[in-house]
C-alpha cells in the first residue's frame, strides 16, 4: 500500500511488550473509561468502546477489569478529568510523528513530551505541522500462517476477498497481513474476513502516513527507535505514529 509504514510491524516484534502488561492495561483502561463516558456503556451503539474492548481482549485483559473501567466511565465519576490531546513533531532525520495522549495535567505531559523530542534531536511542533501527512484508516491484522485451523493467507485471494468486503487495500508481510479500510467500514470488513476463515489478530482505527521516509542511516534509525519506544512507554501516551521505514539491512545492524 502506498505510504504504508512498517513501523507498526516493528512495534509488534518487541518481546518486552509482554513485560509491560500492567502499563498496557492502564492505557487500555483509560481508553475504555473515556469511550464509555463519551458514548455510553453499550458497545453495540458505541463503536469506539467496541474497538477498545476488542483491544483489551487481544491483550488478555481480565474481563473484570474491562467491566470496571466501562462502569467507571459510564458513571461519569472516575476518568472525568482525562483530557485527550494530540501532539505533533519531527523526529531525527525529519521524520513526522503524531502522538495521541490522555492526561490529567496537560502542562506536565507537554513538557515531558517536548523533552523526549529534544533529547533525541527532534522537536515538538505546532498543531498542523505534520497532521496533513497522516489519515485515519481502519487496520486489520491477520495471521499469515495457520492459527487454530484458520485460513492460510494467499495474497491474491485475500485481495479479492478484502475488496469485495469494502476494504481499500492490503499489505502482506512475512509474518502478518494488513487490510486497510475506511474507519466506518472497519467492523464490517473485520467480521467478513473472520467469516471467510481468516485469523484476525487485531482491528483498530489508526493513523496511516500518506507517504513514508526510508531510513538508511544507522544512527538516525537507532535514535528514532529509542524515541518511539520512549513515547510509547510514557504513561500519558496512548498511541504514537510515524512515517518512516527502516531499511532491512540497517535493522540487522541494529539487532
UniProtKB/Swiss-Prot annotation:
Pfam families: TACO1_YebC_N (PF20772), Transcrip_reg (PF01709). GO terms for biological process: regulation of DNA-templated transcription. This is Probable transcriptional regulatory protein Helmi_17570. The keyword rRNA processing does not apply. It is found in: Cytoplasm. Keywords: Cytoplasm, DNA-binding, Transcription, Transcription regulation. GO terms for molecular function: DNA binding. Its main location: cytoplasm. SUPFAM superfamilies: YebC-like.
